[in-house]
C-alpha cells in the first residue's frame, strides 16, 4: 500500500472516533493502524536469524554478552537476561539486523 492509502486509513479512523464522541483515543487509532497492514516478510529479523547470528560471534541474543558466560560472570543465563546500561552497539546491530556491507570477523571488531 502506498502512503496515501495509509493516510486515508488514519483520517477515516480519526473521523469515525470524532463522530462518536469528543475525544480521539490516539493509542487505539495507532494500534488499529499497526494491525491494518501486513508486516514485511524477511529482512533477517526472525528469531532464528537472530540466534544464528549471535551464535556465530559467541554472544547471547538477548543481552549481547559473551555466551557461554565466563566463570566469573553471572548476569547472563540466556533465558531472562536483559541488555546492560552500556552494551556494544555494533554487536547489537549485527545480531538484530545482520550485515549489509561488510562481513565481521568474530572477535575482531566486536
From Swiss-Prot:
InterPro entries: Carla-bd (IPR002568). One of its GO terms (molecular function) is zinc ion binding. The keyword Phosphoprotein does not apply. This is RNA silencing suppressor. A zinc finger (C4-type) spans 60-81. Residues 50-53 are annotated as: Basic. It comes from the Viruses. It comes from Helenium virus S (HelVS). Pfam families: Carla_C4. Suppressor of viral-induced RNA silencing. The potential mechanism of action is based on sequestering siRNAs. One of its GO terms (biological process) is symbiont-mediated suppression of host innate immune response. Keywords: DNA-binding, Host-virus interaction, Inhibition of host innate immune response by virus, Metal-binding, Suppressor of RNA silencing, Viral immunoevasion, Zinc, Zinc-finger. Transmembrane segments: none annotated. Belongs to the carlaviruses nucleic acid-binding protein family.
